[in-house]
Amino acid sequence: MEHTYQYLWIISFVTLPVPMLIGMGLLLFPVSTKKLHRIWAFPSVLLLSIVMVFSIDLFIQQINSSSIYQYVWSWTINNDFSLEFGYLIDPLTSILLILITTVGILVLVYSDSYMSHDQGYLRFFVYMSFFNTSMLGLVTSSNLIQIYIFWELVGMCSYLLIGFWFTRPIVSNACQKAFVTNRVGDFGLLLGILGLYWITGSFEFQDLFEIFNNLIYNNDNEVHFLFVTLCAFLLFSGAIAKSAQFPLHVWLPDAMEGPTPISALIHAATMVAAGIFLVARLLPLFVVIPYIMKLIALIGIITVLLGATLAFAQKDIKRGLAYSTMSQLGYTMLALGMGSYRAALFHLITHAYSKALLFLGSGSIIHSMEVIVGYSPDKSQNMVLMGGLTKHVPITKIAFLLGTLSLCGIPPLACFWSKDEILNDSWSYSPIFAIIAFSTAGLTAFYMFRVYLLTFEGHLNIYFQNYSGKKNSAFYSISLWGKQGSKILKKKMRLLPLLTINNKNNNERASFFCFFWKKIYQTGGTVRKMTCPFITINHFGTKRIFSYPQESDNTILFPMLVLVLFTLFIGAIGIPFNQFNQEEMNFDILSKLLIPSLSLLHQNQNKSVDWYEFVTNSTFSVSIASFGIFIASSLYKPIYSSLQNLKFLNLVAKKGPKRILRDKIINVIYDWSYNRGYIDVFYAISLTEGIRRLAELTSFFDRRVIDGITNGVGFTSFFAGEGIKYVGGGRISFYLLLYLFYVLIFLLISSSIFSSFSSL
């Protein structure tokens, strides 16, 4: 087994050949590489699958052996300095490897169909493969400096993927916002790493933990303790930015401007989990500083509540899920701050699969809506224009519903087990935090079912938008850099555009991961898959052609169905079944896996729970979630609008002082939520405008004062010289007289100054 571990360093580099080969192909055979661009999905999935096989084998060995392996190579050795690189294999690494590879493979398969119409297909897979390489290197790093290198590579890939369609101004602004916000946290992380090295003289985790503990317990110097606390806070600031925790969360909703597969991989399962990974990796260091642990829990509970409330009024389906991600990662951060290491990792796993399912489901919905509204994210992602999709996309609907129920904490789905464990632990930590956490569980159920009901229930609202004559649908393609260009195929009609397809020059292509051949129609030099049937409706004696969303193809549905299985069964790895087993059997896989980490943290490894106590505690949380679902159903389910004609609802709806006051309160809450709590506005006014004005003032001072003094001295010398030239008349005797005169004046001034100082 140890022989196997010696070759695991290759895990981080298995996926690297894909971007290198694509780059070489574009340089040497550009035409052939572009024509055969769809084949590059296969090696991307194949190489990541090889990593997944290694990861599964590693996961099984970790469960059986409960050991930690570390291999390092010295790169630079000096008397006072040594820099080593290597890899660390422990339970945390094995969990993240499984998470990255499984979700990554499913997203790559999904992307083969989702991005097939995009001319930047090759560029997309280059970025994705390089991101997977960076993320694998991050979780296997053996020291802080190595983590920082891969941390920055992950941030760079995130910048490239968010700005994939950078010709759209809103996309370029979003990727810049993500880059700058993460640089704030990364700068703090770098300062924290350098500060820790100055204190301990090492970057290695084991050395850091031992030296740090000795400094804390054996040194009574208050100044030294404050500096150590500051370094720990700076390390935590990097995790705040990367995991979109308050107050550096503002980049995550804007990051949804990237393609939907990116949102599923980066902003649900992997990159935002990097901050959680860093805190979990450094938890033995943080746990000896109570102030830092309290700060981690405080940031977590603020993010939990803030993310849930900001999701209330979002119209964009992906932004709503983004705020949900922010809130759920807050639960994980809260668990780490409370010291519930096992519960935090458990929720990280269950949330990653459930949220990836929801993002891929939203991508399937957007993909279906684009057939009607064209490539226009403002329309295809707007839940106000959706509704009634149940009969059109039934498989997507079921998958999305299961992901929604899981996130709401409904048993027996995955997130129920992990979230309930965090909620139960919060009671023993702080009753106030527990009340907020339980209340947010109800808010989560409310806003998630709001998303579900607006999307799938009722009628397809885009038809009513078109009927009013305000909107007209167009046929869009996506250029190489994501720039939208409309191609209206037929003369616009009042209700919906009449879409016709010329089959004269159509080509048939197949996806590597598609289970049937699909036609791709060539129209005006652009390529677009038409996945929607045309339904002919007789209307006033004439025939009109309407297009409706249709279920996505199998290549998109297959990853969603696999994630459904994870959502249904992944929670079983952390359920404490031990009291029902024989003594020699242990079905609590997660607790058994985390034995080395829990021993390092000096925590109780026996997580068995009395089932009567568990059912009693979970009943309360499920009741709160059910209440949130009920409120969302009563407000957003279409049956509510039909009941408005009933007498008792009309009585409730009558205007009065109390009703007017209630409406004002609701409007204030809605505006606060829709405008993101005015946090972005505050940052724009206080930071962006402040820095801009400071830059303008600095520029003015540089041009007018600094350059003015320099140029003024030059101009003064020039004009003085010109004046003296004409006064002297060319006589040397006159020049000597002026020279003696100025020397005399200088001596008089100097003597007066000297005498004044001597008198003092």
From Swiss-Prot:
| Topological relation to the membrane, as annotated | Multi-pass membrane protein
Q: Does the keyword Transmembrane apply?
A: yes
* Gene Ontology terms for molecular function: NADH dehydrogenase (ubiquinone) activity; quinone binding
Record-linked Pfam families:
Proton_antipo_C (PF01010), Proton_antipo_M (PF00361), Proton_antipo_N (PF00662)
Q: Which GO terms describe its biological process?
A: ATP synthesis coupled electron transport; electron transport coupled proton transport
InterPro entries with a match to the protein in the record = NADH_UbQ_OxRdtase_chlpt_su5_C (IPR002128), NADHpl_OxRdtase_5_subgr (IPR018393), ND/Mrp_TM (IPR001750), NU5C-like (IPR003945), Proton_antipo_N (IPR001516)
Membrane spanning stretches: 9-29, 39-59, 89-109, 125-145, 147-167, 185-205, 221-241, 260-280, 282-302, 329-349, 356-376, 398-418, 429-449, 556-576, 620-640, 734-754
Give the catalysed reaction(s), semicolon-separated. a plastoquinone + NADH + (n+1) H(+)(in) = a plastoquinol + NAD(+) + n H(+)(out); a plastoquinone + NADPH + (n+1) H(+)(in) = a plastoquinol + NADP(+) + n H(+)(out)
Q: Which Gene3D superfamilies match?
A: 1.20.5.2700
- Keywords, alphabetical: Chloroplast, Membrane, NAD, NADP, Plastid, Plastoquinone, Quinone, Thylakoid, Translocase, Transmembrane, Transmembrane helix, Transport
Q: GO cellular-component terms in the record?
A: chloroplast thylakoid membrane
Relate the assembly described in the record: NDH is composed of at least 16 different subunits, 5 of which are encoded in the nucleus.
**Function field:** NDH shuttles electrons from NAD(P)H:plastoquinone, via FMN and iron-sulfur (Fe-S) centers, to quinones in the photosynthetic chain and possibly in a chloroplast respiratory chain. The immediate electron acceptor for the enzyme in this species is believed to be plastoquinone. Couples the redox reaction to proton translocation, and thus conserves the redox energy in a proton gradient.
Q: Tell me what this protein is called.
A: NAD(P)H-quinone oxidoreductase subunit 5, chloroplastic
Q: Which organism is it from?
A: Populus trichocarpa (Western balsam poplar)
Q: What is the lineage of its organism?
A: Eukaryota, Viridiplantae, Streptophyta, Embryophyta, Tracheophyta
